[in-house]
Amino acid sequence: MTFAFNIDTVFQQVLSADNDVLRHIVKDDPLGEEESIAHDRDVIFAAGGYLGEGALANFLTERSNPVNRNRYIHNKFMLVDPLSDDPLVITGSANFSRPSQRTNDENMLILRGNTRVADIYFGEFMRVFDHHYARYLVRVLTDEGRSDPEAGYLKENTSDWLPPHFNPASYKSKRRRYFTSPKK
């Protein structure tokens, strides 16, 4: 799910509920003090970000968007079971924020069962999510003083990185099962 502004309390309550549903959230900026979604380990959050000079060696130069005042996220859509045989794509002008739900003149389309459209939206969501998640992790680790480039995010030995992908309680295992299971 994408959020261009704030995350309304209705969505916060749903996202904070502990369950086994894997959910990815990408938002234009970090969570505000009034926003809380981090109670469930199956909610993976990424905030839009711009890495300054030297933040990541050997990456392409970052460029901002001079046209739009939303610095990182402009698309607004929600995907429910996007890899299933009956996906749900919700998209339109609404930001899923309180004003967009209650007072603004917004529109939304709900597309159900169109696997081609869901695949296209899911591909775009994962592209945007991965782009910002990497930057978000760099920012969080730097803020926590854990920005040692020798610490190694990628492990060389299979035995060092593979086990979490097969631990049923692990996010990595849930993600592996979701992306590799046959459509339902």
Go through each PLM region and give its residues.
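Structural motif
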Residues: 1-5
